[in-house]
Amino acid sequence: MKRQSILFVRSMWVVILFTTLAACKDTDNRVFGDDFEFPALTDENTIRFTVNVVGDWRQLDIVASGGRMVIDWGNGRIQKIEDPSSMSGGVVYRYGNKGLYEVRIWAEELQLIDISGLLLPLSHLYLGNMPRMKSLALNSISDTRELDLNTFCPNVESINIGSFADLEHLEIEDCFRLRSIQVYSNPKLTSIEFGSHPEAESLYCSYNGFSSLSLKSLPALRDIDLSSNEVLSHLELNEKTSISAILIQGCAFQSITDILKCCPSLRELSCSYNKLTELDQI
């Protein structure tokens, strides 16, 4: 009788164990966060980059707003965020182990995202479809030679692209809604093809590798900062532009006569450390 009781108890434990395992199988413990359905994460609908956790700092912060987002942290964990703007300081994730992690972010509903590799090294950035994106900030990312904003975020209004060690090509000519353009500290970026940007009022493009720029397709420009483009010697402006400030110090201009002719409303000019033999008369 006692033996039968022991066998019965063991049988019950086996049943409980299998029931528990079945329940775990039905619940994907890799996925955590808010409760909503999301599409399969593909190259077409995600932002993708590599995180290199090499030191004691293992925390990655991503600021976003405007819609739902899903992040595959690259270690088997997927986080769903209904409202990322409600998270103070952004979405924060801390990696447990050192290593390389391939991160994917579903961002089709987002209107703003800020990704930076300043504290944790990021590389190999690729963009996916972001039709609602209005404000895009990408900083301190290596091993990325080109970015195509035309295809993936054509409705963007503000861009902040900085400190890309290897960026050579940036496509923004079809982003017609651009108002603010900040592209800086990209030493290998030698040219930008500006399309028609009728609403762009500010251009901050310092510390790049430009030798020549044409801004004729930006008629609404008010403020221009092209400082510290060490080989920049030629600049074309729209004659109908009411520019109030131009900063071109630390460039290679030999003359700024043509620039000044296009700026009858100019209030601020900084042109030190160029190759000017004498200051052109205004």
Language model features with spans:
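Concave beta-strand-loop units of leucine-rich repeat
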Residues: 115-120, 137-143, 151-153, 160-166, ...
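N-terminal secretory signal peptides that target proteins for export/translocation
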Residues: 1-8
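N-terminal capping/linker segments that flank leucine-rich repeat
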Residues: 24-142, 154, 163, 176, ...
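Generic short N-terminal amphipathic or hydrophobic helices
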Residues: 5, 15, 70, 191, ...
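C-terminal helix/turn sub-motif of individual leucine-rich repeats
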Residues: 128-131, 150-152, 162, 173, ...
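Canonical leucine-rich repeat
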Residues: 113, 125, 136, 144-147, ...
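Bacterial N-terminal signal peptides
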Residues: 11-20
